[in-house]
């Protein structure tokens, strides 16, 4: 792939100067379509209740699940609503899960005067053996028991369950299924290798010199300022860069100034100001050479709830001079040379990690694809806008590349769907912690990590640069 292309050319760094300097034209993007319009907010009204988004989600998902249930259990299976259930009668029910969790943080529990409880300490996971599942439809709810993995499932998941109502009033689940992968348009064949670079978690403003050096190495490689002719030729095959959130460090979110007297903070500025200036300079270097899509993340200066709206262009006076810079939403979807990308900055996957037993971020990514919903835990444990007409987080179409940013480590996997769908799953690691980005080959849907690290004290040769996969 990328490294193999670089190795095909002779090393030129130590060769005598030449009058004819090699020039490499960047591979053009034949077609590009930004398909993130469903995530753009027109009106911003927070006066509505969140019950509407659950009702809309169930209405939109019900046809997919009824069809999937008949494929899974046979066309003769009866699909009923909860109000139509009869004791001991086996049937299928479609509904939305609610997971009752004793350890789930609750502001009502914390402020309750009669309980006088101390706030719960933060946990990495909130699952407990006493967790229970409740299935809801438009009219009723019923507790579930039987063959169903309580610890793995989360609130907001729409699924179909097969079983019967028992004398204790609970629904005994014998089997269950999800909507599975959405239909997918095949990607057109490409005749040459071209790459999309995925980066997340630059963490600017954190004060780490190693991270800053790695970021500059990344910029220099992409723009062809680093390496010999082999590396520069390979860099010319990078057709687009996607920055998947957390461009600023968590340390820029300090709110200590709120608790200080005004005369102490009158001449100080927010820590994020210098970080945004630094980001503007980095985007200037990148967008002068290659198209760049910038997604916001948890620590970036935009709205906190999903879908996060694009960063404001006034923060980047230098980089916005180039039309190659695109400020996009989180989640973000686009079609690049016929390959459909869909990704988030990682909040959806991190939230499911906290409220389920799934440990692997790549497994969670695949699970959301099977459930056919980007963020089922929103709005219960993850903030989102109170939509009431449609739920934009439902997959209308299966992507070819599905990624999430700011994960602890790199991972990639190709999965197949029941209708020959092919999807590349990518977990993009936090760059400030790992100095690692990901390259996706649009022609083959292969993915490889590429690492950028500075010289350590133990490095005695150029091998310490750590540039490459």
Curated annotation (Swiss-Prot):
GO terms for molecular function: DNA binding. The keyword Nucleotide-binding does not apply. Signal peptide: none annotated. Accessory component of both the DNA polymerase delta complex and the DNA polymerase zeta complex. As a component of the trimeric and tetrameric DNA polymerase delta complexes (Pol-delta3 and Pol-delta4, respectively), plays a role in high fidelity genome replication, including in lagging strand synthesis, and repair. Pol-delta3 and Pol-delta4 are characterized by the absence or the presence of POLD4. They exhibit differences in catalytic activity. Most notably, Pol-delta3 shows higher proofreading activity than Pol-delta4. This is DNA polymerase delta subunit 2. Belongs to the DNA polymerase delta/II small subunit family. GO terms for cellular component: delta DNA polymerase complex; nucleoplasm; nucleus; zeta DNA polymerase complex. The keyword rRNA processing does not apply.
């Amino acid at each position: 792939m990328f490294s193999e292309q670089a190795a095909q050319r002779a090393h030129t760094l130590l060769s005598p100067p030449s009058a004819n300097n090699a020039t490499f034209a960047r591979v053009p993007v034949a077609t590009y379509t930004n398909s993130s319009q469903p995530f753009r907010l027109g009106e911003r009204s927070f006066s509505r209740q969140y019950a509407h988004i659950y009702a809309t989600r169930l209405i939109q998902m019900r046809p997919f699940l009824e069809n999937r249930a008949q494929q899974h259990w046979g066309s003769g299976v009866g699909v009923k609503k909860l109000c139509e259930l009869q004791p001991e009668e086996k049937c299928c029910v479609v509904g939305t899960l609610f997971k009752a969790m004793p350890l789930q943080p609750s502001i009502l529990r914390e402020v309750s005067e009669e309980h006088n409880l101390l706030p719960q300490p933060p946990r990495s996971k909130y699952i407990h053996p006493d967790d229970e599942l409740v299935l809801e439809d438009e009219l009723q709810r019923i507790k579930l028991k039987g063959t169903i993995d309580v610890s793995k499932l989360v609130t907001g998941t729409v699924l179909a369950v097969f079983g019967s109502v028992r004398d204790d009033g609970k629904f005994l689940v014998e089997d269950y299924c999800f909507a599975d992968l959405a239909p997918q348009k095949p990607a057109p064949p490409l005749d040459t290798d071209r790459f999309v670079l995925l980066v997340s978690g630059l963490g600017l403003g954190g004060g780490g010199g190693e991270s800053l050096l790695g970021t500059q190495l990344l910029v220099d490689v992409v723009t062809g300022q680093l390496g010999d002719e082999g590396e520069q030729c390979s860099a010319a095959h990078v057709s687009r860069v996607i920055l998947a959130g957390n461009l600023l460090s968590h340390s820029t979110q300090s709110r200590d100034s709120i608790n200080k007297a005004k005369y102490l903070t009158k001449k100080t500025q927010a820590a994020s100001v210098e970080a945004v200036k630094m980001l503007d300079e980095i985007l200037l270097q990148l967008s002068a050479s290659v198209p760049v899509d910038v997604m916001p993340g948890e620590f970036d200066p935009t709205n906190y709830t999903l879908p996060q709206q694009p960063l404001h262009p006034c923060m980047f006076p230098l980089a916005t001079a180039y039309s190659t810079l695109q400020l996009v939403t989180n989640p973000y979807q686009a079609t690049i040379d016929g390959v459909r990308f869909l990704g988030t900055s990682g909040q959806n996957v991190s939230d499911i990690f906290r409220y389920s037993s799934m440990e692997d971020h790549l497994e969670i990514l695949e699970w959301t694809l099977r459930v056919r919903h980007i963020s089922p835990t929103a709005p219960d444990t993850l903030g989102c806008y109170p939509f009431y007409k449609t739920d934009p987080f439902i997959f209308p179409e299966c992507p070819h590349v599905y990624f999430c940013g700011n994960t602890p480590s790199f991972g990639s996997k190709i999965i197949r769907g029941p209708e020959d769908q092919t999807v590349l799953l990518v977990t993009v690691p936090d760059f400030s912690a790992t100095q690692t980005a990901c390259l996706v080959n649009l022609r083959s849907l292969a993915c490889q990590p590429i690492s950028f690290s500075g010289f350590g004290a133990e490095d005695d040769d150029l091998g310490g640069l750590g540039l490459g996969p």
